Every structure is written in C-alpha cells, then in structure tokens.
C-alpha cells in the first residue's frame, strides 16, 4: 500500500500479485486515463526499472486534481508501494526521482490583486 499526492490529487495504491492489470477507481486504467500515453507511461515508470510490469496488479483509489496530477500521484504511490514490498528498491527509485514528492502547489490569491500575482491596471493620473 502506498499513498501519493500531487497538487490536489491524492492516490491510494495497492499492489497485488497478478498479471499487470491497472484498475483506477473501479475502471481499467486505459479507460480512466482516456488512453493518455504520457500518463500511462508515467505510472508504469517505477515498474519498468525492475521489470515488474507483469508481476503485480495495481488497484488505485484516486480523487482530486486533474488527470495529469492524478497520474503523478499514482506514480508516487506505486513507487512507495514497491519500497514497502522490497526495501532494496528504495535507493534505485530515489536516484531516479520516483520517491520525490512534487511540492509545487497553487499560490494563493492576495487581497488587492486580481489573481495570485496579477495586479489591476495602474493609472498614473
């Protein structure tokens, strides 16, 4: 079991011995991600390091954020779950950046501004 987060997306990933199925919120992964090749490859990245694509079924519950953020949250959750299964995977995953949580989040809106940084038009007179 591994938890991954990215922006507002939170993914709970469970790895079960199987044949490589990806199930996200009860749907096949390809359907849930609208056959987005980038997102699917991103999720499979940690498995490809150790040639484990066909060894585990991945069952995911994910909510919040958009598809890209959800895919990145799932990727982090998969990497953390692989570390729980075998601790010797940790240094390799860490050196390839799969265990790093992307801390970039939306900057808050400030009072007196239109958005986080966008100011109303300045008039000298």
From Swiss-Prot:
Q: Which PROSITE patterns match?
A: RIBOSOMAL_S9
A Gene Ontology molecular function term of the record = RNA binding
Q: Where in the cell is it found?
A: Plastid, Chloroplast
InterPro entries for the chain: Ribosomal_Su5_D2-typ_SF, Ribosomal_uS9, Ribosomal_uS9_bac/plastid, Ribosomal_uS9_CS, Ribsml_uS5_D2-typ_fold_subgr
Print the keywords alphabetically.
Chloroplast, Plastid, Ribonucleoprotein, Ribosomal protein
Q: What is its main location?
A: plastid
Q: Report any one BP term from Gene Ontology.
A: translation
Give the domain of life.
Eukaryota
Pfam families to which the protein is assigned, alphabetical: Ribosomal_S9 (PF00380)
Q: Return the GO cellular component terms, semicolon-separated.
A: chloroplast; small ribosomal subunit
Record's HAMAP family?
Ribosomal_uS9_B
Similarity comment: family membership: Belongs to the universal ribosomal protein uS9 family.
Put simply, this protein is called Small ribosomal subunit protein uS9c
Annotated gene: rps9
């Amino acid at each position: 079991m591994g938890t991954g987060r990215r922006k507002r997306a939170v993914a709970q990933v469970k790895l079960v011995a199987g044949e490589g199925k990806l199930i996200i919120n009860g749907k096949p992964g390809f359907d849930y991600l609208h056959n987005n090749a980038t997102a699917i490859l991103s999720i499979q990245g940690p498995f490809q390091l150790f040639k484990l694509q066909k060894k585990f079924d991945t069952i995911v519950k994910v909510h919040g954020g958009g598809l890209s953020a959800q895919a990145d949250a799932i990727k982090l959750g998969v990497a953390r779950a692989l570390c729980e299964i075998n601790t010797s995977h940790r240094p390799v995953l860490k050196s390839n950046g799969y265990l790093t949580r992307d801390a970039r989040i939306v900057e808050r809106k400030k009072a007196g501004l239109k958005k986080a940084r966008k100011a109303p038009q300045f008039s000298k007179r």
